[in-house]
Amino acid sequence: MSLKVDGFTSSIIFDVIRDGLNDPSQAKQKAESIKKANAIIVFNLKNKAGKTESWYLDLKNDGDVGKGNKSPKGDADIQLTLSDDHFQQLVEGKANAQRLFMTGKLKVKGNVMKAAAIEGILKNAQNNL
């Protein structure tokens, strides 16, 4: 089932992330990401119409990716809130997470260092877009 949501152009990225984590050739990276992050990360994205949607990335248990502000296996350890456009730019390598954070365009609730652990997963998604 697709994680794409109408009105959120970047939502297709969550399908790409899920497919990458489920790819048997990426099993080593998946295990490393889970070990490094050990967190459930929720992405709260706001589109141009002002609507907010959430997706989770469970890097605490099994590398699951899904729709919603909570994994079936636990609450979020980290919440990242940003616009749909900025998330797309971040994954495409056109925006810098640190710069978005410093300018208030990326809000982080929880352990900022654990949030940095998803960099490899986003980079892999960028390569598969």
From Swiss-Prot:
Subunit architecture: Monomer.
Keyword Transport: yes
Motif (Microbody targeting signal): 127-129
Gene Ontology MF, one: lipid binding
Keyword Protein transport: no
One cellular component term from this protein's GO annotations in UniProt: cytosol
Function: May play a role in the transport of fatty acids. Binds fatty acids and fatty acyl-CoAs including palmitic acid, oleic acid, cis-parinaric acid and palmitoyl-CoA (in vitro).
Protein name stated in the entry: Fatty acid-binding protein
Positions where N-acetylserine occurs in the chain: S2
Miscellaneous comment text of the record: Expressed essentially in cells grown on palmitic acid with small amounts found in cells grown on glucose.
Localisation per UniProt entry: Peroxisome
Organism listed in the record: Yarrowia lipolytica (strain CLIB 122 / E 150)
InterPro entries: SCP2_sterol-bd_dom, SCP2_sterol-bd_dom_sf
Keywords from the named record: Acetylation, Lipid-binding, Peroxisome, Transport
Limits of the SCP2 domain: 10-129
Any one Pfam family match given in the protein's UniProt record, by short name: SCP2
Annotated gene: SCP2
